[in-house]
């Protein structure tokens, strides 16, 4: 039998390759804040962080997936299998799941990293082999059932896997934590995918329906060439696009856009707006302060904005900017932030009273 680590060893979180130190720092900070002891086990460019904690099952609901910034996915580790036999990977997994409850679905995954991506074929083939074995053992429903825990097997190489569990209500609903979004030909720029992903990731379906309604009024600061403006028009919002640069003509032709040639960093509306969005290349602290001014002055009710992170101490800068924003906003707000799949050296922030 393959060696097995002790079950319930910690949390496994997937992230963008190269951002393991930021995720490790965030997990350490959030766990300590919640009163849990633990430590991060990771290597740069692995694309994941294992946060070792004896009380992982109790810690998981305290670290909500939607509130974690650098985690694409959050899983509770049931077992680590570091020396699997390629001739029989299924038997040791069934053995560690002998006392586990029935699961509503199975996802077999790998980190989104240089070492992890070549494992996609193994993950797909192994999932097809493991599903019938789990069903025969009474451990997996015939059809996906989101009311039951979801089983994850995460391969980090061909003979090393983590067997994990996720709460479907508190985890990413996409394999690898990556939403599959298609860039439509009419999108003015790839940045449109950022705002599409932000709306999917930072808001629940119920919140999206309540907060992104046709007829709402929005401002897009630093709008050119119009990627984020275009996304807002697809929500049937009326948009003030603020930029000295040009917008794509087909964005203007929607009839929902007014292009104002001005500096998006200094412009503000005469009347309060429902939404403000901003994806400007500027120092993150300056952006955080300007976004706070918008809320303090009552110029918008909801906002989505990007913070471009420095090359070093990115977790420290993230905390500083978000604290600065909340201190200066002058009102209680729900603030959620994520490093999205379509983000690069940046995070995307939602701020809203959510009511």
From Swiss-Prot:
InterPro entries named in the record: RlmM_FDX, RlmM_THUMP-like, RNA_MeTrfase_FtsJ_dom, rRNA_MeTrfase_M, SAM-dependent_MTases_sf
GO molecular function: S-adenosylmethionine-dependent methyltransferase activity
Residues that bind S-adenosyl-L-methionine: 191, 224-227, 243, 263, 279
Protein's GO biological process: methylation; rRNA processing
Record keyword Heme present: no
Short name of any one Pfam family annotated for the protein: RlmM_FDX
Any one GO CC term of the record: cytoplasm
Keywords from the UniProt entry: Cytoplasm, Methyltransferase, rRNA processing, S-adenosyl-L-methionine, Transferase
The UniProt record lists the keyword Cytoplasm: yes
Positions of the catalytic residues: 308 (proton acceptor)
Main EC class the enzyme belongs to: transferase
Record-listed E.C. numbers: 2.1.1.186
Record Gene3D superfamilies: 3.30.2300.20, 3.30.70.2810, Vaccinia Virus protein VP39
Main location: cytoplasm
Subcellular location: Cytoplasm
Catalysed reaction, written as an equation: cytidine(2498) in 23S rRNA + S-adenosyl-L-methionine = 2'-O-methylcytidine(2498) in 23S rRNA + S-adenosyl-L-homocysteine + H(+)
Biological function: Catalyzes the 2'-O-methylation at nucleotide C2498 in 23S rRNA.
Assembly information from the UniProt record: Monomer.
UniProt family annotation: Belongs to the class I-like SAM-binding methyltransferase superfamily. RNA methyltransferase RlmE family. RlmM subfamily.
Name the record gives this protein: Ribosomal RNA large subunit methyltransferase M
